[in-house]
């Protein structure tokens, strides 16, 4: 059986400050750095050996991937970065404190923006300091595909081609795969892998630690699902 290990990035500085992060390129906190190292230690203890790793183009996921691979003595494993594994784009909520946003817009509205499958938050202004339209890491993309806001539905739509073109073929080739990504990009892929309904995915949370493991048969049917160390 092949294994797919999802590791959400360790706690970021904005997680710690309770801010909406999205595509803002925020670093790991001290706690988050240790979580990434501990994830690698759990991987080593479990004896999981990877053939390929994938991550986003955001430093908190990249660092988590590198730290986890290093701690599991697998830093040599090839790592491919893709914007398609980025966190959900929180639009105009990016950088806002979650509690303050609830006071400004109301608890119910913020809850809908955060937890509904297909309701978009307000768009981010194109001149916002965190706008991806002026970020050179996305310079090769057509401007029309760069989001100003995303819900989970849109996040899945842009992550799914990467699953179909990269991750699934690697698994079908018998490769064990590590994916260092983000809470919502992982949730989106979990929805697809498990065939969850729009309502069912709303109750799924992906913690910063520990990593989530899926084991598949040769047809990519899920054989088992578990968190390392639990």
From Swiss-Prot:
Pfam families: His_Phos_1. The active site is at 9 (tele-phosphohistidine intermediate), 87 (proton donor/acceptor). The keyword Isomerase applies. Its EC number is 5.4.2.11. It catalyses: (2R)-2-phosphoglycerate = (2R)-3-phosphoglycerate. Keywords: Gluconeogenesis, Glycolysis, Isomerase. Belongs to the phosphoglycerate mutase family. BPG-dependent PGAM subfamily. Catalyzes the interconversion of 2-phosphoglycerate and 3-phosphoglycerate. This is 2,3-bisphosphoglycerate-dependent phosphoglycerate mutase.
